[in-house]
Amino acid sequence: MKIVDAFIFYNELDLLRYRLTVLNKHVDYFVLVEATLTHAGNPKPLFYEDNKKLFAEFEHKIVHVIVDDFPKTKDAWVRERFQRNCISRGLSQLDVKTEDLIVVSDLDEIPNPKSLDILRKEGLTDICALKQDMYYYDLETLVQDDWLHPKVVSYDFFLNTLKSQIGECRLILPQKIMRKAGWHLGYFGYSAELIQNKLKQFAHQEHSKISKDDIEVRLGGRVDLFDRDMTFTHIPLAENKNLPPRHELLLAMCVSSVSLPAPSCTTPSCESVHEDAGLSSNKSQSPPPPSSPVVA
């Protein structure tokens, strides 16, 4: 059985290195999808393409998909979904079997390698959610709400249920949920300027007008960028029992994201068996989230 880690990419070179490093021994391939336009419709450099030499040790595992054929639209969500569904273009370049597994997540949604190992051992015929701890800004600011958007699907489920619209799996709340299955690192290590840049370019254009000064206030106070009803908890690193693997790389990470335009940078089974990172059943299944995904 093979595992393919598939995600869309914007410009976060250091976070990309972290993801590739911690998952390299646990997946067979990476499908990295980057585009010539932002979700807001603005031209952007191909940051991975321009910096491939920084990732030479992983290149033999990476299928790089460049999206330059967006449909003509003013809708940022149409562009977002189109780019994510282009994961299928990467899968078509691999010898993927029906029993193989596809991880579908954003770059900052880091799967737990132990969870992937369990799935590889036990298999999956349809879909499961990776229940992740959600951090904002740093590794000491934990959001009380769990994050359920990252999914793992079998290639058979992708072909016959999703009908190749792989991005739609993020909107499904499946019966199977794998606990302690990763870490969502929202705006991790970002300065106010970098956050403002991302907000101007991503699909949630309703948040694109937030000022840099307002962002700095929210960063300093460790409060939500979008005034949502979210509870932030400070948890010292020494007291955290579920830190990401090799978290020292995250602490030392200098985010390489830059304002656009810019030159190239130089620099799993039943709950009782797997208590820490196993599959459990979502007994009270809720309806899927609305068509616009939750802001990350």
What residue ranges belong to the model's regions?
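N-proximal low-complexity "stem/linker" segments adjacent to membrane-targeting elements
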Residues: 1-14, 18
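Short, acidic, metal-binding catalytic loop of nucleotide-sugar glycosyltransferases
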Residues: 22-29, 33-37
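Active-site-proximal specificity loops/subdomain of glycosyltransferases
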Residues: 44-98
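Short beta-strand-to-loop acidic/aromatic patch adjacent to the donor-nucleotide binding site
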Residues: 99-110
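Conserved catalytic core of nucleotide-sugar-dependent glycosyltransferases
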Residues: 114-201
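C-terminal catalytic/acceptor-binding lobe
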Residues: 172-270, 276, 296
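Low-acidity, Ser/Thr- and Arg-rich intrinsically disordered low-complexity segments
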Residues: 269-272, 280-286, 291-292
